Each structure stands twice: as structure tokens, then as C-alpha cells.
Amino acid sequence: MNIIEGSFEAKGKKFAIVVSRFNHFIVDSLLDGAVDALKRHGNVNDEDITIVRVPGAYELPLAAKKIAKKGEADAIIAIGAVIRGGTPHFDFVAGESNKGLAQVCLESEIPVSFGVITTDSIEQAIERAGTKAGNKGAEAALGALEMVNVLAQI
């Protein structure tokens, strides 16, 4: 029986982090968590991490697609925070961002890790950005590290 599993070691691999500026007070903590995870768990150097800032979560898929087409990243990490308000805007932005990022991943065959938190309140967002519920940016980075290694073995 052959079992393929990923590890976190990724020295020499290139990572792009596409980051939404909207809700930056939350997103900055998610970004810090992602960068820390890449360096600490993946042994990734600063020069192998590219950070691309876009206006909001809706713009993440287009930037990820452009990065994937260039072929210079082994994995892409998408980071953002969509917080529910009083209108259906939340549903459109969260759904289209998720769908677009999944499409980029499947079409490019490059891991696109989903670090976009979708919450009902600012309090929930804060919890997912490094307090009670861990840091979802760090979790997305760990997923990217593992997938780079899994795909290299398939």
C-alpha cells in the first residue's frame, strides 16, 4: 500500500499571499499568522514570499488567477475577512470569492489555500484572527505547505 501525505517543510518553494485590504484590522492579523506559519513550520525564506494586496475579498480570485498564470508560485494563500452586515452583500462577496478561488485552484493545478474568514460579527472575526479560535491565516498557510508536498508526490 502506498500512502501519500504532505509535510510542512517547503524550503526553496515560492508562496504568494493575496490579501484583501478591506477589514484590514482583522486581515493584518491573518496575514501575520500566515507569514509566521510559512517561516516557522515550512522553513520558507522572506524572499520566497510575495504579498499582493487587493481592495477586497471579491478581487482575490482575479489576482490569484494572474499569479497562477505567471507560474512563479508553488502555492497561493488567499486571505480576507467578510463580515455580515444588514444587506445581502455579504452572501455575494463571500460566495463569489470562494467560488473564484476554487476555480483558480482547479484550473491551474496550483494549491490555492482559503484563508478568507466569513463571520456574522466583528467579535467572531477577532476570535478567528488569533484569539480564541486560533488564526485562520496560519491554518491556510499550513494547508498550502502540505498541499505543495502532496502534489509533488502524486
Curated annotation (Swiss-Prot):
Its EC number is 2.5.1.78. The active site is at H89. (2S)-2-hydroxy-3-oxobutyl phosphate binds at G86, T87, R128. It catalyses: (2S)-2-hydroxy-3-oxobutyl phosphate + 5-amino-6-(D-ribitylamino)uracil = 6,7-dimethyl-8-(1-D-ribityl)lumazine + phosphate + 2 H2O + H(+). It comes from the Bacteria. GO terms for cellular component: cytosol; riboflavin synthase complex. Pfam families: DMRL_synthase. GO terms for molecular function: 6,7-dimethyl-8-ribityllumazine synthase activity. It is an enzyme of class 2 (transferase). One of its GO terms (biological process) is riboflavin biosynthetic process. Pathway: Cofactor biosynthesis; riboflavin biosynthesis; riboflavin from 2-hydroxy-3-oxobutyl phosphate and 5-amino-6-(D-ribitylamino)uracil: step 1/2. Coiled coil: none annotated. Keywords: Riboflavin biosynthesis, Transferase. Disulfide bonds: none annotated. 5-amino-6-(D-ribitylamino)uracil binds at F22, A57, Y58, E59, A81, V82, I83, F114. Belongs to the DMRL synthase family. PANTHER family: 6,7-DIMETHYL-8-RIBITYLLUMAZINE SYNTHASE, 6,7-DIMETHYL-8-RIBITYLLUMAZINE SYNTHASE DMRL SYNTHASE LUMAZINE SYNTHASE. Catalyzes the formation of 6,7-dimethyl-8-ribityllumazine by condensation of 5-amino-6-(D-ribitylamino)uracil with 3,4-dihydroxy-2-butanone 4-phosphate. This is the penultimate step in the biosynthesis of riboflavin. Forms an icosahedral capsid composed of 60 subunits, arranged as a dodecamer of pentamers. This is 6,7-dimethyl-8-ribityllumazine synthase. It comes from Colwellia psychrerythraea (strain 34H / ATCC BAA-681). The lineage of its organism: Bacteria, Pseudomonadati, Pseudomonadota, Gammaproteobacteria, Alteromonadales.
